[in-house]
């Protein structure tokens, strides 16, 4: 087990290149869902009328405190359209229940310093799980959007065992993580899972953990006894990059993940594009000229046969990390191997530039460790194959979230569902 320590009291010491990460999540979520109608996002029909009303009022207060950090009572009244006496009573009850902390006097912007309140970051948690072909990463996020102590990494058995054994293993490692962190399981309210391969809008996986009825989403919810959300790893990577990565606030972004396989998450007009049944972005299986090798999908000449981590490792006969280290030490064969992979990847990206006219292309996944050894040949190929006016509008960047973009994206996936007022039944409270 590897533990990547990201201390809850100071996430920014670890993520130095994007130190604004936690504040940005809260700010963006608030801007996106500030005026949500809480009465439409929870089903508590079994509660008596007055109790249901109080429940919804508390839920609204928790929601705004989660997204905005610290608020005074007048600000809470304005945001929730609830009277001061009611807000005062709700705040007192939430403090007694352990959800809210009285922070005392906050900063003044003129006049008397306001009395402010915030969420107790340990009142509830969100589970994030990134199931890769070569790794399993697990994190538990608090209400400050910080992974508690760190992101834990375990070996993956996704391609070695059947679905039942894999699920047992995932459950075992989740339990191990919870035990290692010594937290109350009952405080984990929701979970987000990232998986490689084909996943439809309903959360059914068609490549790994292929339970068609009732589907892997329902099976995980039964296993964990909490709401679970599932998406393709490239899609959640795109969500993370667009929210607090190098593609923050960029309207049209193609996020390409290069791990053992190749995937694509597309942000078009600032929204994740999923396609008709949710399976858009199988970039690794486009046909590239001059390639004749058979792909594991059964086709011939796919991009994955030359530019994926699996293809690079197959040629070199060693792990990707060792190949990258050799290239850094001026090993000509390793440099040539990465250059060819990057060149063909850039040829494929040039086609995507012509089709989608993006503002930015972000390369992420395990390949980010190669840096310019991969980025330079990719850019050269784009310059060679893409129309000048279109490539001139498009920036090419490596992810600054590194190998953690997918697991950070699982948090964003949960938050998107939590504060989407077209969905019902999801609440931290």
Spans of model-derived segments:
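Glycine-rich phosphate-binding loop and adjoining helix at the ATP-binding site
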Residues: 150-252, 373-385
